[in-house]
C-alpha cells in the first residue's frame, strides 16, 4: 500500500522557534514509528522563508541553523512575490500538512489560511479557531459569554492604558495581577505585577509584542492544571495533569518560559492530578465546552488555575501544544494509554476527516448577470 505523504512544518519567526524544533523531532519520531507515512520536512526560518527539504532535515537534526539558512537564501530570488513559500515545490506533492509551528504563523491562523488556499488537509484547528484562541482577549470574551468560568480581566491599548492607573487596577482586580500581550504564547510578554513601578514596566514590555494587552487578576493559592483534548465532533479529553513551581502557593512563583522549556527540574508534576471527583469532572467538562466554543479541531491543550477553594478557572487554550520532552501534553496522553505513535496517527486521521467534512459544504453562487441600476434623484 502506498504510504500517505505528510509534510511536517516546524520553526517559524516567533520566540518559540527552538521549542518548535524540539516538538518536531518528537512528532517526526512518532510518525515514523507508525510505519504508515512518508515524512517530508519543511523548516520555516526565523526570517519567515520556507527552506527546502534537505536544508530542513539538517535543521531538524539540530545542526547549526544560521549557516544553513544563509546558504539557502543565496539561492532565493527575493524579488519573486512567492519566494517565501517557493520551497514547498521542492518535494513534489503530499497528502496532508502537519504544522508544529508554535506562536506566530502556526497558532494565529496564518499557516492554516495557506493550507486552505492550497486546498490541502492539515492537522489541527481551522484558521478561525487558531486566530480566536491566540487572542487572549477574544478568547476570554467568548468564554465569558458562554458561561465558562475564567478570571476577571481588563483589556487596554496604548491609548486606553492611560486611563488605568495602578490604583484603579488594584480597586478593580486586586493587588496582584498578570499583564499579558494579547497575541503571544508561552509566557512571552507576560509579567507578574505587585506595585505601580512593576505595572508601568510590564505594560511597556507587553506593548513590545502587541497593541492589545490583557490585565488579569491573580488567583489565590493557585495550582496550575493542564488537560489535553483531541478530536473533531466527538473530542476525547485526557487525564488532568498538575504542576507546581517553588513558592507558587504564596503567589511568588509561576510557570514561566524558563520553567516550561529551559529548566523544569524544580517543577513538580502530578499525573493524574489529585483532585476530587467533582472537580475532575468539572475541569474536563469545561475543557470540552471551551474546545467546542472556540471551534477547535484535531488537538489542543487547555490550561486551568485552581484556587484555594478548589474552584477551577480556565486560563487559556493552546492550539498547537508543545511536544518536547518537557511538555505535559505529551505525558498526559501517555498516561491516558495513547502512546505517541497512536496519537499522531489519530491526529492525522482527524485532519483528513475534517477536510472531507468541509468539502461537503456548498460554496456555490448566483451569477449577477447584467447590472440594472436604479434611478437617482
From Swiss-Prot:
Binding site for Mg(2+) 2: 316, 318
Residues binding Mg(2+) 1, per UniProt: 303, 316
Top enzyme class: ligase
Keyword field contains tRNA processing: no
Protein's recorded name: D-alanine--D-alanine ligase
Gene: ddl
Pfam families: Dala_Dala_lig_C (PF07478), Dala_Dala_lig_N (PF01820)
Gene3D superfamilies for this protein: 3.40.50.20, ATP-grasp fold, A domain, ATP-grasp fold, B domain
Native source species: Leuconostoc mesenteroides
Keyword vocabulary terms for this entry: ATP-binding, Cell shape, Cell wall biogenesis/degradation, Cytoplasm, Ligase, Magnesium, Manganese, Metal-binding, Nucleotide-binding, Peptidoglycan synthesis
Amino acid at each position: 500500500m502506498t504510504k500517505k505523504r505528510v509534510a511536517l512544518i516546524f520553526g517559524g519567526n516567533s520566540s518559540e522557534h527552538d521549542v518548535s524544533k524540539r516538538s518536531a523531532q518528537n512528532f517526526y519520531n512518532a510518525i515514523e514509528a507508525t510505519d504508515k507515512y512518508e515524512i517530508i520536512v519543511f523548516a520555516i526560518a526565523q526570517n519567515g522563508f520556507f527552506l527546502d527539504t534537505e536544508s530542513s532535515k539538517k535543521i531538524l537534526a539540530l545542526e547549526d541553523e544560521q549557516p544553513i539558512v544563509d546558504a539557502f537564501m543565496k539561492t532565493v530570488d527575493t524579488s519573486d512575490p512567492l519566494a517565501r513559500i517557493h520551497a514547498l515545490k521542492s518535494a513534489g506533492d503530499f497528502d496532508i500538512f502537519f504544522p508544529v509551528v508554535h506562536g506566530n504563523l502556526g497558532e494565529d491562523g496564518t499557516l492554516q489560511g495557506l493550507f486552505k488556499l492550497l486546498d490541502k488537509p492539515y492537522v489541527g484547528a481551522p484558521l478561525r479557531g487558531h486566530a480566536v484562541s491566540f487572542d487572549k482577549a477574544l478568547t476570554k470574551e467568548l468564554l465569558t459569554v458562554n458561561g465558562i468560568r475564567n478570571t476577571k480581566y481588563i483589556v487596554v491599548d496604548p491609548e486606553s492604558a492611560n486611563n488605568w492607573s495602578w490604583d484603579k487596577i488594584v480597586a478593580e482586580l486586586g493587588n496582584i495581577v498578570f499583564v499579558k500581550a494579547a497575541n503571544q504564547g508561552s509566557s512571552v510578554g507576560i509579567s507578574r505585577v505587585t506595585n505601580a513601578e512593576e505595572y508601568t514596566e510590564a505594560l511597556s514590555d507587553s506593548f513590545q509584542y502587541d497593541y492589545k494587552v490583557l490585565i488579569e487578576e491573580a488567583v489565590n493559592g493557585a495550582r496550575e492544571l493542564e488537560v489535553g483534548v483531541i478530536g473533531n465532533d466527538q473530542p476525547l479529553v485526557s487525564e488532568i495533569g498538575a504542576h507546581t513551581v517553588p513558592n507558587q502557593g504564596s503567589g511568588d512563583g509561576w510557570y514561566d518560559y524558563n520553567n516550561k522549556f529551559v529548566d523544569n527540574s524544580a517543577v513538580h508534576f502530578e499525573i493524574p492530578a489529585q483532585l476530587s471527583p467533582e472537580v475532575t469532572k468539572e475541569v474536563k467538562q469545561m475543557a470540552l465546552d471551551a474546545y467546542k466554543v472556540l471551534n477547535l479541531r484535531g488537538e489542543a491543550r487547555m490550561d486551568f488555575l485552581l484556587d484555594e477553594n478548589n474552584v477551577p478557572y480556565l486560563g487559556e487554550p493552546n492550539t498547537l501544544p508543545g511536544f518536547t520532552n518537557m511538555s505535559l501534553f505529551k505525558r498526559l496522553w501517555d498516561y491516558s494509554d495513547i502512546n505517541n505513535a497512536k496519537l499522531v496517527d489519530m491526529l492525522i486521521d482527524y485532519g483528513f476527516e475534517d477536510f472531507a467534512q468541509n468539502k461537503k459544504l456548498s460554496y456555490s453562487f448566483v451569477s449577477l448577470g447584467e447590472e440594472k441600476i436604479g434611478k437617482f434623484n
